[in-house]
Amino acid sequence: MSHSITVLKSKLHNAKVTHALKDYEGSVALSPELIKLGKFSMHEQVHLWNITQGTRLITYIMEYDGDEKGTICVNGAAAHRANPGDRVILATFAEIDSEKADNWEPHIVIMNEDNTQKK
């Protein structure tokens, strides 16, 4: 019998927070190339797991409006849980039919220190 299950859709692993703005509308703002690299969508729910601090939170993705590449800007209340330089995992999930789970392949990108993809 088939049913829906939640699976890892995509993640950026070992990325680095570049900014944390407490006095800002909540979310995590990513530079456009990171949104594309992670196969994320605007306003998509994202889990932010802070490797440095050992904390986890859930927020949503928005596009960073500056010119800097490799930007991960944690905003609002979430900025109390992430500091510039912290290593993080950004993960999104999807609902799929359980019969497809064994063949599911999440999109996983391991990051360099400068928030580019490791080769």
Map each language-model feature to its residues:
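Compact, glycine-rich, soluble single-domain proteins
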Residues: 7, 16-18, 22-99, 114
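Flexible, glycine/charged-enriched surface loops at secondary-structure junctions
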Residues: 102
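C-terminal binding/interaction regions
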Residues: 83-84, 105-119
